[in-house]
Amino acid sequence: MKPSKFSISAVPPFNLDLSARIFADGDPQIRKYENGRFWQVLRNDNSLVLLTIESSGEVENPELVVEVRSKEEIASKNLKSISNMVINIFNLNMEINPFYVEVASDDIMKRIICRLQGLKNPITPTLFEALIDSIVEQQLSLKAAHSIENRVIKSFGPSISLDNEIYYAYPTPENLAFLELQELRNCGLSFRKAEYIRDLSLSILNHEMDLEGVKKLDKTEGMIDELCKIRGVGVWTAEMAVLRGLGRLDALPADDIGLRRSISHFYCGDVRISSDEARQIAQNWGKWRGLAGYYLIVADMMGLNIDN
């Protein structure tokens, strides 16, 4: 089927290279950023589509070119829906300048922002995906967790074949709810995590857990409290889920070892800090503390030296 193409403008500033760089080590059959191109399979109207996204603008005048490929004809109404998904995934409508103004008195953060101008935090297509990933990542290194996540996706997610390449989409609750626990464990999950994932999927299908209702809550704290009612979901998991799945930028997963390490690297001379100490430092960032934490993680990942 002939691919469809369209352009999307983003609220400036926006830098695709910085914003998608977190996917540079991704699995090319699932989601990856390489040589200025990002691609991922998504669901649209019960069909799978492969998106390829490239930048055609500048940081202060950002524009993206999106190519959509599918096995089926894509209706114009579905292209609009796909456009909205791209806007959500890369947070294209977010006004980021107020964040820069808010933290301008923090000299360290100000210097990091100068190097990462236009970085926006990606958001998962669904809250379910953010929850599952956060459960998988409990008490694991990111490398180990991503390996397990990829195995879950390739084992149970739907796939699409295009030009002799197979691509996989994230599993839905329907894909996971009725699995044998051993099937999930074969992906590298512990027995408990396999239980949590299957039980969460089943509770969504049985309408016992309403993730859409969680999204409609006004306050981040209420969202976290609601998610913590799910078996296997504690405060850290819920904070990670609302930050990466709903873009709640006031959520700071201070119990995260990687985040504390990045905060310490830039603010405390790499001395180990506690969750409370991380929260104390984060008070400087107000309602933007989750985004500020993300900037620190990316800066640390890139090995930025802000002393020069």
Walk through the language-model features, giving the residues of each:
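HhH-family (HhH-GPD) DNA N-glycosylase catalytic core used in base-excision repair
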Residues: 1-308
